[in-house]
Amino acid sequence: MPLSPTRSLRAAFACGALAAACGPVLAAEPAPPWTFTSNVNLVSDYRFRGIDQTWGRPAVQGGADAVHSSGFYAGVWGSNVSGNVYPGGNLEFDYYGGYNGKINDDFSFTVGGYGYAYPGANVDKAACGSAAYPAPCSLPSQSFDTFEVNGGVTWKWISYKLSISATDYFGANTKTGYSKGTHGTLYHDITVTVPLPEDWSVTGHVGRTDVKASYGTINPDYTDWRLTVAKTFAGGWNASLAAVGATNSTFYAPPTGGLSAANGDTRKLNQTTAVVQVGRTF
């Protein structure tokens, strides 16, 4: 028989008087040390550091994360990509881990590593005769897989993060036409997120890529930016609208840069565009 309000109150008083007897029944279970979450997203165009990864087409993305109460974390993430950008491949698989620490309520920090893998993709599968690989050409065997170490700090709404490539940066080295290897390439990320009422937020981001080599006479360094308006909903749902772009059309846009597909289609990889995203976290 369910307890009436009066009986519930009496039971509470009884436990107060007999704590030794009732304590084990009322004791809260300790929080588990690990928290596991997953996410899935649909985006109208996948941009990485301002550069088009899907040839202007949509992407389905998803990931899973494990976070320990001590601050350590690890996760995986994946997305479809275009074979025009990563010849021979159509998938990006990322893996990462690290530690998030907190100094006080306003100041926190992070250190970690992040890997990018593109199964099946290789420079030797590119279309010879493109802007990146003008004919006649003999394309080398070179993957795009990359690993970075990173560290960052956050103060209230503002964060800064530095990523340093521990490998050649997405296959850029002397074999692929660069003046030297590109390990040590830097990516600076400054992000400001302003929370708004009703679970809205506005985020502004500026990034700077400093590639440790030139491509012929062209400097591939560039700045990217993103302005995002986002909204979270009940049940883990979220949506956003972003304006995204990047500089250095000399390197990332035809006729001196960019990429060409096997059918001759060209793409300005850094053009400013709107990106719509809908996702859910579980």
Located regions from the model:
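Repeated loop/turn-to-beta-strand initiation elements of outer-membrane beta-barrel proteins
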Residues: 70-76, 105-111, 157-162, 198-204, ...
